[in-house]
Amino acid sequence: YMLYESTGESIDLKLEVEHLRNYIDLMLLKYKSDELPEVDFQADGTLEGCLVAPLILLPFVENAFKHGINNNGEGFIKIRLDTSSEELKFYVNNSRFQDRNASGEHKGIGLENVRRRLKHLYSDNHNLEIISSDNEYSIDLRIGL
């Protein structure tokens, strides 16, 4: 997917969602069956024919696994994607554990890159809201279609 299908300026949302599901399945392989984290991904609306920038949603799911699930499989991730003819809504909510990166290196780089990419690709036709507390982290992304 990353090498061949996502090389253009846009990709069918159905393929992007399929890639997200594959990524989630891959991440869950590292946990034993008795310590699987709670991961809930629901996609509603019409996915086929809806074009988005490739890999624009993946960094949020990557961050949810990185910061929302500890090594024992404790934590949760809730992902919702909904499309209408006018808008894509993408919501990720996850538990939050203390920063694993004690040195502070690379902190927030991925998120800053996504912000820049959204600004470049969607200008003022998107909104990204981030809500962070001690125990939970949420992003609410809306992109005009």
Q: Language-model features: where?
A:
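Two-component histidine phosphotransfer core
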Residues: 1-131, 136-140
